[in-house]
Amino acid sequence: MSQAIVVAALYKFVTLEDYVELREPLLKTMLDNNVKGTLLLAQEGINGTVSGTREGIDGLLAWLRSDPRLVDIDHKESYCDEQPFYRTKVKLKKEIVTLGVPGVDPNKAVGTYVEPKDWNALISDPEVLLIDTRNDYEVAIGTFKGAIDPKTETFREFPEYIKANFDPSKHKKVAMFCTGGIRCEKASSYMLGEGFESVYHLKGGILKYFEEVPQEESLWDGDCFVFDNRVTVRHDLSEGEYDQCHACRHPINAQERASEHYSPGVSCPHCWDSLSEKTRRSAIDRQKQIELAKARNLPHPIGYYYKAEA
């Protein structure tokens, strides 16, 4: 591809006892390589999405892989014409993806990884229960044909959804997927602990499936939400047509942008009647700053939103 900016989603579950000490050298490496975005560090591993030039991303990956614990860190790439991030951050967390269930440790037990080339065959098996582990607003944009939508607002709700709806003695084969592989990997560890026997998850997530499976063979329907300013990507990993409401963070399509309830940066049909006056005023002020920065051809550091896959 000819686009100048490389967007790299990366993660690995691995015990990092020194994760606090890793923060500063990791941040310095990102800054030295002019890499933008946010990486999360916790005792259970590393997670995040970053962007930069080819040389910059390669420099960061080389530094990470110089640590024997991260030599095989999982990463997926896509491309765009402009920087999707304006800030460079390394944050310390309790979990690199928040499930909120003590004792769930993907470093000790996870389900069976399924390569993208084998995924279609698995999910076409009528005995396989296919679960989308992502949040409701992500599923609404696109998902695999036949997948169950848990309708969760956060990953923290996933355990209760499983307990309320599925029985290990009845549901013998379970396959799960997520954007980059991290949520479904942690979900598989949780489900094994709950007694589910045959648990599968898509290695590298939806993004790796897009990367490796030809579009004409795809069982995916729609776009895929991504955690940067592109908002969504298509199967060919090109930027989708969605924008994102900066007030409620909900993806919005062309029809929703045409709504009388849509005001750029302030509200959309999903939130216009639920915003507090304080939030609305803050959004209006923020949008004015963004527009002023654009008029001056300057980047606006709070004009874009990043959140690690959660």
Swiss-Prot record:
Residue stretches spanning the membrane: none
EC assignment: 1.14.-.-
Tagged with keyword Ion transport: no
Catalytic activity annotation: uridine(34) in tRNA + AH2 + O2 = 5-hydroxyuridine(34) in tRNA + A + H2O
Active-site positions on this chain: 178 (cysteine persulfide intermediate)
GO MF, one example: oxidoreductase activity, acting on paired donors, with incorporation or reduction of molecular oxygen
Domain spans labelled Rhodanese: 124-218
Biological process annotations from GO: tRNA modification
Entry keyword set: Oxidoreductase, tRNA processing
Function according to Swiss-Prot or TrEMBL: Catalyzes oxygen-dependent 5-hydroxyuridine (ho5U) modification at position 34 in tRNAs.
NCBIfam families: PRK00142.1-4
Family recorded in the similarity comment: Belongs to the TrhO family.
HAMAP family: TrhO (MF_00469)
Stated name of the protein: tRNA uridine(34) hydroxylase
